[in-house]
Structures are given as structure tokens and as C-alpha cells.
């Protein structure tokens, strides 16, 4: 619910009909969690929420061509930022 609400606030009524590449930037408060544990769960929930909110039609192979992950430390403002790059039109 929190992810869907954040998407609705940030992306308003955006609807993407082409395939996309998603860049994830994870800002963690410390180095306690394994990188794959951070990214794996986040990909699932964020991509499902993008579909639920109507930003993406689906989150299958034909809709998301790939993604990349970057990890940073930010003790005071942990967050996840995503950039959605729409591929050819």
C-alpha cells in the first residue's frame, strides 16, 4: 500500500505503453543487509505496484527489458529512487 501510494503521488496519471528499463538506486542506513536481499524484494514490490497503479501494462519480459541496481549509504534519509527509461516508440 505504501509503495502504491508513493507511485500515485510521484507519477500522477502516467501510463507507459512501450517497454522500459528501470534503474534502481538504493540508499541504505548501514551495510547490515545483503545487497541481493535489498534488491530482490524491492524489484518485486515496486514492479507489481507500477502495474497496479496503471503506470505499466504488465511487468513481464515484453514490458521490462531489464534493470540495474546501485547501492549507497545515507544514514539520515534511507530510500529507494527509480528511473524508468522508456524504450523505442
Outline where the language-model segments fall:
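Catalytic phosphate/metal-binding cores of nucleic-acid and nucleotide-processing enzymes, i.e., regions
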Residues: 1-89
Amino acid at each position: 500500500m505504501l509503495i502504491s501510494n508513493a507511485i500515485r503521488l510521484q507519477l500522477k496519471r502516467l501510463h507507459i505503453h512501450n517497454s522500459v528499463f528501470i534503474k534502481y538506486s538504493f540508499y541504505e542506513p548501514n551495510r547490515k543487509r545483503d545487497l541481493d536481499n535489498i534488491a530482490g524484494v524491492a524489484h518485486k514490490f515496486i514492479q507489481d505496484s507500477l502495474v497496479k497503479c496503471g503506470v505499466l501494462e504488465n511487468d513481464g519480459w515484453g514490458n521490462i527489458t531489464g534493470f540495474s541496481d546501485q547501492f549507497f549509504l545515507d544514514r539520515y534519509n534511507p530510500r529507494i529512487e527509480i528511473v524508468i527509461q522508456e524504450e523505442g516508440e
